[in-house]
Structures are given as structure tokens and as C-alpha cells.
């Protein structure tokens, strides 16, 4: 079921595009014949458009699949109202030997660190991310790291939220004879497959979040600020420990300018995730020093008893 295609007669299994089911007016009886409906990536069904698909597909049995069922906006209750609550959750797989290099980056250049505020005085994050991704010195840091790990024999994926950022990096990598390819939305399946064969893949976070399965990847570089990297990081954990040549490596660029308080909080959230997964976290400071991350436990203050004579 997709757009004007309605091929369901005599079929035991039917694949349907949620977008089409949500917005197209198919005959009601089309969906009455199904006994089981499986919604992949069901966390998307909390969206205003996509939830309409569940109102049309009301099978006796409804199953939702998702690696991230909890939505930031709290709208998981929308699809849970149709599908039901979580009934099974796999345990987190403990991946041994994963290393995280958190690399602090700082610059006073206004083209990079300018604080963009709206009329309410709140930061305009898209503009600030644009500035960060357009700043060549920072991008060159990402490229130098990529070249370093490529020459070690690692298979690298670079993720950024800006397509033009990826284009700039791809051009430099190709000029330096590093086999590289894009992995972004809108590309044809053949071209995506071609990119999968490259030593360096440049993709968007949205593409890495879903549908990417490239087992050979072992190194990920987070080239633009991001809060939730759970699914993105999972892309370098596909190779089994007993056959891998390199341990999984996460390169996390941490923008430390005081104007980037929101990005600082995002960085802390990522580090919290790394700690929960028991990854080894190495902090690369601006002064060149390197130290292992150790969370300092707060000592509870002792109560004081006051006696009035």
C-alpha cells in the first residue's frame, strides 16, 4: 500500500507506507481483513499526521517496534492508546571495549560562537548550529581526526545535522584520496549501497537513527551538537566482539564556549548515556591534556541540631 498502489487481494502479508495510510482515503474494508498490524519505528506515530494511520488500521492484534519508545514531547501515550503499553523490552547489551573521546573545542571567533537570540531572549539553536557547522577551523579538526583513523584502517562514519556541512567535508576527503560517500535522505538505493562500501561515510543523524545497517563501521564522529545519540552510536556496535579488528570508538566534539550553554547540557546528557553503558570516557582538554572521566559523587551534608538554651 503506497500512494495510488493498493495491492492487497490474495496477499497474506502486505507492506504499507504509514505516510500513505495516514493521508490517503483508502476503502475502509481494505484494513478490515488484517488480523495483525505491525508498526515499525512506532515512536513516529505520536506525530499529528502519522497517528491517523492507527485510527484506520484497527486489527485484533497490534504490535509496535521501537528502540526509542519514549518521546521527548511525552506523546508516546498517543500510540500506546492504540497499540497498548510496553510488554517486552530487551536488556541493554553490554558492549565491552567501547571508548569515547570527548574533545573540547573552543574559539572566540564571532562567526563561530555568536549567541543568536530570539525576541524573547532565548537561544535560536538552528542558527547557532549553522554557525558551528560553517566554521572551517572546527570542521578541519573533524577532517584531521577522520584522516587519522582512516589511515589506521578504521571504518568511519561522520554524522552532522547539516547537509552542506557534509558536502564540504566530502569534497575535502575526496581531494585527499580518502574513499568517501554520502548517506543522506533522498538518495537512490543504489547510491546508498555504493556509499556503504566506502571507508568513510558521511550521513545525517536522521538517516543514522533508522534503517542503517553497516556492520563494518567501528568509528563514529559526532560532528554537530546533538542531545540524543543512542541510535546513532548503535551503528558502530554491529560487529561481533570475537571477529572485530578494532574496538568501537566514539569521537564526541564538545563545544565549550560560554555562549553554548544549551550545547553544554546536551554534552552532559551524552556523557550520562556513555557512563550508563559503561563506556571508557577520555576527556581531551583544550590545553592538550587527556584524562579519564570520573564522576565526582556529591557528599551529603550532615544535619545540624540547634539547641536553644
What kind of feature is each model-predicted range?
Residues 27-34, 53-59, 215, 236-245:
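Short, conserved loop/helix-junction motifs that constitute active-site signature segments
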